[in-house]
Structure formats: C-alpha cells, structure tokens
Amino acid sequence: TPIRRQRQMCIRDRDWIAKIASSSKSKVSTKSSLYADYFFLNKLSIHLYMSNSYVNDSYKTFSRIVKYHKNDKSKFFVVHDDIDLSIGKIRLKCGGGHGGHNGLRNIIQHFGEDFYRFRIGIGHPGNKDLVTDWVLTKFSPSEKNTLDNAFIKFHNSLDILAKDGIENCQKFLNTD
C-alpha cells in the first residue's frame, strides 16, 4: 500500500504528475484499463502515466500502455526511484539492469532492458542490510525540499526532451 512505501517515489510521483498537469492546464484522468492515471501535455505531445498497480506488478501498466498506443517500447520512458543516486539527482539513460528495484526487475523480465529511464535519486543508507527499512521510511523535511527542487528540474527536462531531443535532455540532467 502507498502508506508503507513512504521513501519510494510513488507517493511523490502523484504530486509531481498533479503539478505538471496543473502547470500545463491538463486534467489528470484515470484509465482503469491501463492501471494508470494519465494526462497529455499538449504543448509537448507527451503522455504521462502513473501506475496504480503495485511496484512489483509494474509490467502490467507498462504492457497495457505500449499496447494501447500501438507503439514500440523504445518510445516510452519509465520514471523510478534509485537508491544508488544521491537524493534529488536525476539521470536519463537507456538500458541497463534493475539495480535491485523490483518494479524495474518486473518490467525487464517481461520486456527486456531496452527502454529509457528517468532515475530519481533517493539516497542510500550506506549499508545494504538497511535498504529495505530505508525505502520504507518517510523523507525528512530537508529531503522533501531537495525532491521539490528535483521536481522543477524534471519538469524542465520534459520541455527539453520534447523540443531538443534525448541527447540534450541527457546533457541537461546528467551534468551537475
């Protein structure tokens, strides 16, 4: 349930989607057949979906969205939390492993590794034995502030992605 996944980005994602939709004067709709909340950024021609399924069942949403759009999975971007990035860092890459992320593991099992990902850092506790508890804890006020700033960068990156392409978006996100 969302209450138990406090550190994971799923709760913040809903806030981010609502903010992006609001700033673009778009309405968030639920598409239950896709297991997702959805809106279209008209000026950018970008569709954003927020999965309503459990993280471990992420492929359900991903597969239905790909099928719904009659499109190739290479045109889709998965946004996920990443404990291997410091909090608030955002990276864009294509391919790679799951890094222990169960949602990615689930998508990779069904679709392979060849898709783009926006990786949003949530930090690491410093000891692998503490990871499970770490991803279930709430963010501190300072961490929330850092993530709010990351949201602004993420939102700007969508503009760059739509107008200037993937390479420029990667340059924007992957350099600090």
Question: Across the structure, where does each feature detected by a protein language model lie?
Answer:
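Single conserved hydrophobic/aromatic residue that forms the stacking wall/gate
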Residues: T1-I11
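Short, conserved active-site loop motifs that form the nucleotide-linked donor/cofactor pocket
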Residues: R7, S45-I46, F76
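Accessory terminal and edge-of-domain segments that mediate assembly/interaction
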Residues: Q8, A18-A21
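Short, surface-exposed acidic-centric catalytic microdomains
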Residues: K25-T61
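Hydrophobic/aromatic beta-strand patches that form the interior of the parallel beta-sheet core
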Residues: Y49, F77-V79, Y116-G121
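Conserved beta-loop-beta/alpha segment of the NTase-like Rossmann-fold superfamily
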Residues: F62-Q109
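Phosphate-binding/catalytic loops
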Residues: K89-H98, L104-D176
